[in-house]
């Protein structure tokens, strides 16, 4: 048995990094590098399939601990075909020895970012990918969670065109009552997929910010290039207004922050660019849905259930096969304020269920 043979050999090395995942996981192969760890594929000697293993070493930084804990907490509670799951977590048996955490997930061949660099998508593919994104997002939003970092590289794909949403490190519980903030506070998610209200007066605590990101992703699938590639966040806003045109008086009224509102009023008037001029070969129904997702005013932006029911997705739409979460998700405490030592304890507890001999 390969596992037994490998057991005595000590941990495997990948590109100078220790990958201590034996004896169950062997035959490691490098896939890529994330912000705080390496991803490899490996052979799972129990289930007899290849899997992806992400090595995370977050414990030096409060922010990395926070993101790791958020991702683990959410993914262990979510169960959905269009959301990546966690199959196993490997870590040291004691908190003192725990320097790294290895997260085992289904192996997906590629992601939408890589695919769009090399392939022009047919309308059928665009429609099917968009449907799966929204089907996953319906479940996420039904749990009262916001992803807050939807972008092509966070959409995993395999050769049969199954799509899974990944990377919940920036996710939050929706909190519309605490959404208001000052003008242009730095926000962590990738700028190009950021809703305009985040640059203006919102913390991004409402579900509509994810819908905006999905609109940006749809536009990118239609043209193989990002629709709003801003260089900094004022530039980002200018890109958006350059296509959507100047906001109406009604849309300006929903911007509570006066500094932000006055900034918009100071800009020269811009007309909306028709979608069919930007995407002359696109399906007209796709452009109608795009228009409803890329709406400046978050209160008028389409919601995920309405988007699924849009005529563009008619061939796939089936509310009885678009499951929702059993209960809304709750973080027992706000993680932002906890020191990294406390976060490490919480990660240790959260991963205990995968330890040999675990009793809950």
From Swiss-Prot:
A motif (TXY) lies at residues 185-187. Keywords: Acetylation, Apoptosis, ATP-binding, Cell cycle, Cell junction, Cytoplasm, Cytoskeleton, Kinase, Membrane, Nucleotide-binding, Nucleus, Phosphoprotein, Serine/threonine-protein kinase, Transferase, Ubl conjugation. Its cofactor is Mg(2+). It comes from the Eukaryota. ATP binds at residues 31-39, 54. CDD domains: STKc_ERK1_2_like (cd07849). The modification Phosphoserine is found at residues 29, 246, 248, 284. This is Mitogen-activated protein kinase 1. It comes from Bos taurus (Bovine). The gene is MAPK1.
